[in-house]
Amino acid sequence: MSPEIIDSSDRYSLKPLVGSLLSKIDELLDQNKALLARIAELEAKLGTPPKTPDNSSLPPSKGQKANTTEPATGKKQRRKGHPGVARALCPNPDATRDIFAVRCACGVPVLPADQVLAHAYDHVDLPPIKPVTTRINLHRAQCPCCNKTVTAKPPTDMAPGSPFGPGIVSIAAYLHGCQMVSYNRLVEVFDGLLGLKISEGAIANMLARLAKPFAVVADKIAAIVRNSPVIASDETSARVCGKTWWQWLFASASAVYHTIVPTRGKCVPVEFLGGIRPKVWISDRLAAQCTHAEAHQFCLAHLIRDAQYAIDAGDDIFAPGFKAFLQKACVIGRKRADLADATIAGHARTLKRELDRLLDLVPKQLDGRRLRDAIEVTARDKLLVFLTRRDVEPTNNVSERGLRPSVIFRKVTNGFRSGWGAAVYADLCSIVATGRIHHRSPLASIRAAIAV
């Protein structure tokens, strides 16, 4: 509005104009206040430390790589020696060849009865790999009594349908699920290494038929884990049909169960437990992992990284002492096998007093204050459960190690194109991981599951 219009207006016409201008000023002041708050928030973010593998769950592969140091240009230092290591002799060789000396260098013959063992070594080789094809001929005849046709039944170990036996199926499942070999490369491996012509479709059909026997074994594994007193759990993302799903792991001392589902919510462990309440649950601080057991042990390794992030952000009151407290607790946890119960109880009392002292501190830095408040509210009774039971670990490394192959599988294969593929892979992970606990090779575990 031009000044001339304002000068020519009387006071009655200016009153609504002034009111609208005051309203506009209030609106602009509110907008300015919101923008200033947003600027302060962004400036605060600029001052936060970057996420690294040491202060967050960022994997080491995504961390900053330090430059390698140039080798010193002088006299090369001698490497410290170490005892030599040789392959041990096989305790049960498949065959033995006794080689006797024939004659001395002077020409005199040497009798075998006069010779003693001078040296023994193993020669290991593979026989020629060739598929064995068995033709099944089912015969029939007319019953001489009732004149009905009687046809021979096929053998149970060589049923009609797919021509490929459990040896081929187990190798395909192992190479694809454990070694991340694609269907295309599996065709080349079977042809070039095993001398077997097979198509990608046949491989897919093989794996699809494994759904039923694998599910039977996986259900038994789930029951073992479900009824265990101590359960560790973790989850990682999975790609199914182009969408983000979640692979959950539930581990006990004698079995490991995997499942791939569309959600990361609390409904997954609730459905898995089916009303059973274990003694102790080990996990990170994810809300979906809480309130499933009588006691809960938080992973101290996760909390050490959280404390390190608060230290990097500038907290020098709570986070440094809390990190030292967690590291001391982990050291005691690793030494429990050599400690008496009374000694462990003494360490528990000392650590509880130290935790009380730390929680009485009042950090001024925002991240340190958030960490301290979170520990005070949700984690105070979930840090030292491992000192009350020897079968409880202070960290959840068993779950992270169990999910690591699945993370590599996801990166190599880019996920699953079908729901049944994800289900078969989860059951395969359960079978292989449980077999390793009982000192069985992955291939042996797969073959045993197929035979069910």
Regions found by a protein language model. Give the residues of each.
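Catalytic center-proximal scaffold of phosphoryl-transfer enzymes
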Residues: 11, 136-452
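Short, flexible loop/hinge motifs at secondary-structure junctions
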Residues: 1-162, 232-233, 283
